[in-house]
Amino acid sequence: MERLIIKNNKVIGKHKDKRIVEKAINQVISFFGKGKISFQIIFVKTRKEYSKFVGRKTNKWEAGFTTGNDIIYLFDKDVFEKVSTHKKQYFYSTLVHEIVHIYTYQYLWFINPIWLTEGLAYVIAKQMREIKKYKKRDITKAHYEEEWFDNPAYSTSAYFIDYLIKKYGKKKLMDLIHNLEEFEKKDAFEKKFKEVYNVSFKKLGKNFSEKSINQI
């Protein structure tokens, strides 16, 4: 296990993956335009050690997670392919994905909707190309953490964020995000979404969730 400390977007000290981490941070900041974040990355070597940090037995597809608002647990690049179902080349996108979560928690200061945080992370990390099988899930029922556990709408969330950006522009999405509370309620989100996009999220999200990958 190795620990890497980042303060105000800068990696402190030496590490074999220092440049990769700095590149990942810059990719996240570049998308949002501004912001400074401070956090730690714990590079894990074994599945047993990773599961211990998570607090349960983990699946082999799980390769990184963020806890609190300032710690990322991630399999070390040298063992990434050996201990997970992911190719070594996806170490970087997984790193970016988790840094997006740090940014949304620390700088944007919102947790709900979960589908929004996950969709953003996928889009910014350019992980949509890694989605092997698109799974239709109702993102209107993926707002709270407990809903997400029953309805982990990863691929639908990613494609919906991508759709919003391409159809309406990134500025509208940023306007929505910057107006969110930390624990945004569903009703409040629906109102804010309609103010920005002039359409009901329940309607738009539901319709989008029912489409197949070929219809998106």
List the predicted regions and their residue ranges.
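Solvent-exposed loop/turn segments at secondary-structure junctions
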Residues: 48-49, 79-81, 109-110, 158-159
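Amphipathic alpha-helical segments that form well-ordered structural scaffolds
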Residues: 23-27, 99, 160, 192
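Active-site scaffold of zinc-dependent metalloenzymes
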Residues: 53-92, 99-106
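Acidic/histidine-rich, surface-exposed loop or edge segments in extracytoplasmic proteins
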Residues: 1-14, 77
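Residue-level preference for long, well-ordered alpha-helices that form the structural scaffold
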Residues: 13-17, 153
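Auxiliary, metal-adjacent structural segments of Zn-dependent hydrolase domains
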Residues: 17-73
